[in-house]
Each structure stands twice: as C-alpha cells, then as structure tokens.
C-alpha cells in the first residue's frame, strides 16, 4: 500500500515521503495515529498545500523535545535506595517504570516507561551506577546516571551472641 507520511517515523521515513508499506501496518498503526494518508492524486495535492504547516508543527515538536532532553540532561543523575544482599544484588529489580516515575517527579513533565532505554535491555539488578538513555523524540536522546544504593545496613553475623 502506498502512503504519504505526515510525520517522521524511525526506520520508516521522513515527513512527506511517499513509501510502500504493508496494508496492515498502514491500517492498524499509521492511519489511526494520523501519521500517514493513502497516496492518491487528491491527497498528494492537499499534502503539498499543507506541507509548510506540517513542517512547522514538526519543528515545534522538535523544539519541545530538545527542551525536555536538556532538562533531563541537566538533572544528571537520580538516586534510588533499595534493599539488597551483602554482595550487592537487589531484592527485586529497578525497571523502566520506576525510573520513569522518578524522572517525572524530578523534572515536572511526564516521561513514559517506553522512552527509557536500559543497559542490556534488562532491569537493573545490582547496586552501583548505571547509565540510562531516554528516547525523547525521533533522533533526540538524553542521558542519565542512576545511582542505586543499599537502604539496609547488614550486621556482621560474627557479632551475634
């Protein structure tokens, strides 16, 4: 199915591109989210008339995303205290939902869990520093350091009476 993209989409195309996609992808994703229209002569003419409006909307989204990325980068790091073993392994794990919630509380705008890119695409399971990437918009990313600390100090077993 031939469509005209109304928004830039990673690994698919840029705004205004006339591309061929599978019909299910177009019907189930692109059309409902208003990211593309069917490529016809009429739609092509309408798109050419409204192209400057769409590009200005895209520019405003990009500026907003750059502002958000700067705010997250300025945050620098967040600290999480959790229970862990003597060896530094967490009782549980820190996932993208936990990190997104802390970032949202810190910066004042919503960061969704799907925007968080964890190292090795797995939850954080040990004490220490972990570098996390946040996908803000198409090619705009922010970096953040997550410090995980132990909340319980374990006593040495030899001191028990």
Swiss-Prot record:
One GO cellular component, as annotated: ribosome
Pfam family, one: Ribosomal_L9_C
Keywords of this entry: Ribonucleoprotein, Ribosomal protein, RNA-binding, rRNA-binding
GO process annotations (BP): translation
Gene Ontology terms for molecular function: rRNA binding; structural constituent of ribosome
Database matches in Gene3D superfamilies: Ribosomal protein L9, C-terminal domain (3.10.430.100), Ribosomal protein L9, N-terminal domain (3.40.5.10)
PANTHER family: 50S RIBOSOMAL PROTEIN L9
Family: Belongs to the bacterial ribosomal protein bL9 family.
Function, in words: Binds to the 23S rRNA.
Protein name stated in the entry: Large ribosomal subunit protein bL9
Organism, scientific name: Blochmanniella floridana
Upper lineage: Bacteria, Pseudomonadati, Pseudomonadota, Gammaproteobacteria, Enterobacterales
């Amino acid at each position: 199915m031939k469509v005209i993209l109304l928004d830039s989409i990673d690994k698919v195309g840029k705004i205004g591109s006339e591309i061929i996609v599978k019909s299910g992808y177009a019907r189930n994703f692109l059309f409902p989210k208003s990211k593309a229209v069917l490529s016809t002569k009429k739609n092509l003419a309408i798109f050419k008339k409204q192209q400057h409006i769409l590009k200005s909307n895209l520019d405003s989204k990009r500026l907003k995303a750059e502002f958000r990325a700067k705010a997250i980068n300025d945050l620098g790091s967040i600290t999480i205290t959790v229970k862990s073993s003597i060896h530094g392994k967490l009782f549980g794990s820190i996932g993208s939902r936990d990190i997104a919630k802390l970032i949202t509380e810190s910066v004042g705008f919503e960061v969704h869990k799907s925007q968080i890119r964890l190292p090795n695409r797995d939850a954080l399971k040990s004490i220490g520093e972990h570098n996390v990437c946040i996908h803000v918009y198409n090619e705009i990313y922010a970096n953040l350091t997550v410090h995980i600390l132990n909340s319980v100090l374990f006593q040495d077993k030899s001191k028990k009476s």
